[in-house]
Amino acid sequence: MPYVNVHGVNLYYEEYGKGPAVILTPGGRVDRNGLRPMAALLSPKCRVILHDRRNCGRSDVVIGGELSEQHLWAEEMAGLLVQIGAAPAYAAGGSAGSRTSLTLAVRHPEVVKGVFIWEVSGGPRSGELMAPGYYGQYIEAAERGGMAAVAETEFFAQRMQDNPSNRERLLSMDVQKFCTVMRRWSATFAAPNPVGDLTEAQLKTITCPVVLFAGNTPDEVHHVSAAENVLRLVPHAEMRPSAWTHAEWDVIGQHDHTFPGIAATNRYSMKATVYAAELLAFIDRVEGSESAQAHATVTQAVGVK
């Protein structure tokens, strides 16, 4: 199985196709599989990279580091792209994948050609609503029954099943250290920023082109203001209408009366054709612009009018 070690963390990845590199990042802490339909549609024209972030899928569980989890994901994504020779790449994703792709463009602009995102997570209560699921429930488990109780939670039990080496790493962790890191990550995650763990000042530094989809209502996790903030703050951002109609969102979307069993992973695959077509058009436009600029530079250098 293909792994790459970035700053001591083993990251699982897969790649398909040839052409401009695209790295796809899913939402939440889910694995890469929800984006497989989109990868299939992109692979005839692109080099598509699917990956599991730290603490996701088959990659290592590592609860530590000075940065927030979101910024660690971006740092390690940059390292992955460099090590496999895929930088610069187009970073695409939804929800957690949207904010991680934006964070990658903030922290490592040299590895990003463009950002393509949907279901941008943020808004007045987004972090507050998500922090208990991301962090709070595991802090409570650790305080109640130590690391053995954490290992018995559905999420971490799956991490050990997907990657057996995670068992020893998780069970050998100091409970106090685990809780300290998780509380710090939770506090950063819950802070009221325009988009996830990114400030207005950070978003303004993004220099690459960005295409994003408008948010939907009702959705307090991916509030409509999050996408609007990206459009307002990022210099080269363009917004497309939501991939969902109001009638579709009423039964599929992320809100109190969502149809049972519909998660973000399901939603992404249902709109894979829409996202893939828009992303390919975006890539063609950026690549065409670069070719035109290169031609103009050569022409100017040789003095051709």
Q: What is each PLM-predicted segment?
A:
Residues 5-61:
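Conserved HGGG/HGGXW glycine-rich cap/lid loop of the alpha/beta-hydrolase fold
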Residues 50-92, 258-274:
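Active-site loop/oxyanion-hole signature of alpha/beta-hydrolase fold enzymes
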Residues 93, 97-98:
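Catalytic nucleophile loop
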Residues 99-107, 113-143:
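Flexible "cap/lid" loop of the alpha/beta hydrolase fold
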Residues 171-201:
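Hydrophobic, aromatic-rich cap/lid helix
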Residues 206, 212-214:
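Short beta-strand/loop motif that positions the catalytic acidic residue
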Residues 219-226:
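Conserved alpha/beta-hydrolase "acid-adjacent" motif
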Residues 236-305:
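Catalytic active-site module of serine/aspartate enzymes centered on a nucleophile-bearing elbow/loop
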